[in-house]
Amino acid sequence: GARAANGVIVVTTKRGKTGKPVINFNTKLTYTPNLNTSRLNLLNSEEKVDLELQLLKEARFDILWGLTDPIAVFPEKGKVAAIMKQYNLIDIYKEQGWNGLTPEAQNAINKLKTINTDWNDILFRDAFTQEYNFSISGGSEKVTYYNSLGYVKENGNVPGVSMSRFNLTSKTSYQVNKMLKIGMSIFANRRKNNTFMTDTYGLINPVYYSRIANPYFDPFDEQGNYLYDYDVVKSSETDEKQGFNIFEERANTNKESVTTAINSIFDVQLRFNDQWKVYSQIGVQWDQLSQEEYAGIN
């Protein structure tokens, strides 16, 4: 069955027929390619570094309020500004430009242009969905039956996001006599969803983060340890506890929900003749939803 706004829609077309047992099995594999972000025309590392250099040179400040330029520029954000602050060169750069920077600062800034992190490639993936269905049906003149089992495993384009569903259907009809026919149907399914704790505009949401993360930021060092992004949070780079790494966050958060539903339907049919029939149906449904959210202290 499928849940509707005011109840449950039950598909009753699949029923057993008189005759020898009929066995069916089918499987389906669905491929969902990785997201295509080429049309977004995002900046690469060289373009982003050049933009930061331009904005940093053109921004104006005052002592009390900081920025006076109407352009929304935050000189403390961005790796270019961090490098200049490290060498105490922001004022010199504003007066003398690129040639006023020390060779060490120039080399550090130029190195940023060589790092091009493909966030679409490391945050998303190609995904596959597997579906299996098995059924057996048959019966005699008095009793017919239809039983089926189904299983679906769907992986999301984001690693760690998945859905699995198991469903069972059992239908039996009894022809008591020429007038009376009774039946019983049972529909059961269990659905499990795995994802992460986030919201639409949360940094842990890869769709959102991949659009604001700098292309020159590498989330791991050469040993595979986490590196932290200080440009997407309101914090200072001197405060290591406030740095952000989406992979560390996702490794320490989890959200799992399990939904179980069982629906039983009993029906009675009285047949007086070909023109006159009376049909009655009653159903009972049981639902259970459990949800678990986890967020580590890190």
Predicted region positions:
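Outer-membrane beta-barrel initiation region
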Residues: 122-126, 136-140
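Short glycine/proline-enriched turns and hinge-like loops at secondary-structure junctions
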Residues: 2-4, 160-163
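Surface-exposed loop/interface segments of Gram-negative outer-membrane beta-barrel transport/assembly proteins
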Residues: 17-115, 126, 156-161, 167-261, ...
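Membrane-embedded beta-strand positions in outer-membrane beta-barrel channels/transporters
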Residues: 8-10, 131-133, 167-170, 187, ...
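Short, charged beta->alpha transition segments
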Residues: 132-135, 236-238
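A beta-strand signature from Gram-negative outer-membrane beta-barrel systems
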Residues: 1-24, 124, 129-131, 144, ...
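Outer-membrane beta-barrel strand-turn architecture
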Residues: 15, 139-142, 174-178, 270-276
